């Protein structure tokens, strides 16, 4: 989706920036660079005015869109629809909790672009846990709403859910949303089986 949007914009002769690598594939990034796509970071993005910028599938926090309005940046939004829906759910949960009594928890990798976009929906207040072992950081006497980065392990998510269910106070509520992308999750058994038959995978 992101590649198609980039090719369309570049094919129309427009100068196009991409906020971060468009895909995790150096060869494809180089091909698009030859077509005119320029990859930038957030520091460079914040200095742009009157430019066209593509947002990749991982999504962005609200601050990125705010800066676009301020600097007259045209956004070509290639955010994955699954990620957009997840952002909206987290944002609604956060804004509905006016007294900020709930812990909004995201099972994900700190610093990952998707996770930064999700945390941004909560004005930076969401708690990120990278592994089931970190679930002990949560306050089991307070309400918990659990979400997941779309590409995390389904087994890890289930382990976290089970731990919270077994330890949360009777006076607190626990809600969770399995937001793991099935296209990714369904690949994992095949990848494990494939890996078991080979010594090295490039």
Question: Residue ranges of each PLM-predicted region?
Answer:
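The feature marks the mature, well-folded catalytic cores of soluble enzymes
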Residues: 1-201
């Amino acid at each position: 989706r992101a590649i198609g949007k980039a090719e369309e914009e570049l094919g129309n002769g427009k100068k196009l920036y991409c906020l971060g690598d468009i895909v995790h594939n150096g060869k494809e990034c180089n091909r698009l660079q030859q077509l005119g796509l320029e990859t930038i970071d957030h520091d460079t993005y914040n200095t742009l005015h009157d430019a066209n910028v593509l947002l990749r599938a991982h999504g962005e926090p609200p601050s990125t869109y705010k800066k676009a309005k301020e600097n007259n940046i045209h956004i070509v939004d290639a955010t994955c629809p699954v990620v957009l829906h997840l952002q909206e759910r987290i944002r609604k949960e956060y804004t509905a909790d006016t007294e900020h009594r709930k812990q909004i928890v995201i099972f994900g990798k700190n610093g990952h672009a998707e996770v930064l976009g999700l945390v941004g929906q909560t004005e930076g207040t969401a708690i990120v846990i990278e592994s089931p072992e970190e679930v002990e950081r949560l306050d089991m006497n307070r309400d918990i709403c659990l979400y997941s980065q779309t590409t995390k392990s389904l087994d890890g998510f289930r382990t976290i859910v089970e731990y919270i269910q077994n330890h949360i106070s009777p006076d607190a509520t626990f809600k969770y949303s399995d937001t793991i992308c099935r296209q990714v999750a369904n690949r994992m058994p095949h990848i494990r089986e494939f890996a078991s038959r080979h010594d090295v995978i490039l």
